[in-house]
Design a protein with these regions (language model features):
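Surface-exposed, short loops/turns at beta-strand junctions within beta-sandwich domains
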Residues: 80-85
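Cap/lid segment of the alpha/beta-hydrolase catalytic domain
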Residues: 195-259, 264, 312-322
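Alpha/beta-hydrolase fold nucleophile elbow
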Residues: 271-281
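Short beta-strand element of the alpha/beta-hydrolase
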Residues: 172-174, 182-192
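N-terminal cap/lid segment of alpha/beta-hydrolase-fold proteins
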Residues: 22, 26, 134-180
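Proline/serine/threonine-rich low-complexity linkers at boundaries of modular beta-sandwich domains
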Residues: 9-17
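Low-complexity, Pro/Ser/Thr- and charge-rich linker/hinge segments at domain boundaries
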Residues: 108-142
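Hydrolase active-site cap/lid region
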Residues: 285-334
Length: 365
């Protein structure tokens, strides 16, 4: 009883910052006004004379920034947008030398959002050729049982296969139901970073083959420190490697690796030949969309908060996807000035330019 009481007291001392809109679905039409209520509470009670930093405005382009003291721990404010998009409110409260944060985003006519990126004329040709060229390299797979990860229902392996060229390999964790049979399959694609992978054992236990891939061409069962060292060293900022050359851009081989992973599933696992899915979040959300768009074997896909989308939006002062390639450029004219001259075959204004050509996909039917 004493421990329970003490625990309750500790939890009751928590500082909580909330930001809430005046609509339950957080959705408005352009031109309408959203009302937000900010509250800073301690032990469930509004905190008097609390200092806060406030930032509000369009996502990634907040134009209201203030520091103020909330006498009664609460604040009401309004926001509106003339263009479809998202309005964000961020609040940081300063209490006893500590910072406590709250945030809220409201959507304005989100169904009317339009992409800024233009489909390159040679997009389909570029990717079809790249995939065909990669398939000239045999998968030449390897497979190693991981007994410490196996369960009574699932066998777990570290596998690898050649990707875009000989000796460049993709490593992954393969989970296969123990029971003999043909199964649906799920490709899991990763968010940004460098890390080991455990495999999706649970989904496999429910009767599906799962293949969780890494994208960096290194084994996925080493100690975490190895990945930290690589991420802070050779692979720091890998998402920007060779971004001016669509044939050498880091994500070209990553996307091709996803397609080769499907090839591996089709050829080397007891896949049923019918149900094939792909899923991932952030960077993995992008890879989910790209894989589903480029390979018609995919029958279901589940992207979660996809990154790497609509990069050129930032040239119009509108929120774009991570990693915000052009955020430091103020306008489309500045972007054009940074590109080669029109006579250059790598001219960024041409339909098949690298900045447009690497992150597109066929329309999903």
């Amino acid at each position: 009883m004493v421990m329970a009481s003490l625990s309750a007291q500790i939890r009751g001392n928590n500082i909580i910052v909330t930001v809430e809109p005046d609509r339950q679905d957080w959705t408005y039409k352009t031109g309408e006004t959203a009302q937000f209520v900010v509250e800073v509470r301690k032990s469930g009670t509004l905190l008097d004379n609390v200092s806060i930093d406030l930032a509000a405005g369009p996502e990634m382009y907040q134009d209201v920034k203030k520091t103020m003291v909330l006498k009664d721990g609460t604040l009401k404010l309004t926001g509106s947008m003339k263009q479809p998009g998202f309005y964000r409110v961020d609040v940081t409260a300063h209490v006893d030398g500590q910072d406590y944060k709250g945030a809220c985003g409201a959507a304005f006519s989100p169904e009317k959002l339009q992409p800024s990126t233009v489909m390159p004329a040679d997009f389909s040709e570029f990717w079809q050729n790249a995939i065909a060229e990669a398939r000239k390299t045999d998968l030449n797979p390897t497979k190693r049982l991981l007994p410490e990860r196996c369960t009574k229902d699932v066998n777990v392996y570290e596998v690898s296969f050649q990707n875009i060229q000989p000796n460049y390999r993709t490593y992954a964790i393969l989970c296969v139901p123990v029971k003999e049979g043909r199964y649906p399959a799920l490709l899991r694609v990763p968010g940004a970073g460098v890390r080991p992978y455990g495999g999706d054992v649970w989904t496999a236990s429910q009767g599906a083959i799962t293949l969780e891939i890494g994208i960096h061409g290194i084994p996925v069962t080493m100690e975490q420190k190895v990945y930290d060292d690589v991420f802070n060293g050779a692979l720091m900022g890998y998402w920007e490697f060779n971004m001016d050359d669509r044939d050498k851009h880091y994500y070209k081989r990553v996307v091709i690796g996803c397609i080769r992973a499907l090839d591996y599933i089709a050829e080397y696992t007891p896949w049923n030949g019918n149900e094939l899915g792909v899923s991932g979040s952030s960077q993995g959300g992008f890879l989910t969309l790209a894989t589903a768009a480029l390979d018609k074997r995919i029958t279901y896909y589940a992207p979660v908060h996809a990154a790497l989308c609509d990069h050129t939006n930032s040239l119009r002062g509108i929120a774009c996807g991570w990693p915000h390639y052009f955020m430091k450029m103020k306008s489309e004219s500045e972007f054009a000035q940074s590109c080669p001259t029109p006579s250059d075959p790598m001219d960024c204004s041409l339909p098949g330019s690298p900045v447009h050509g690497i992150f597109q996909a066929r329309v999903l039917e």
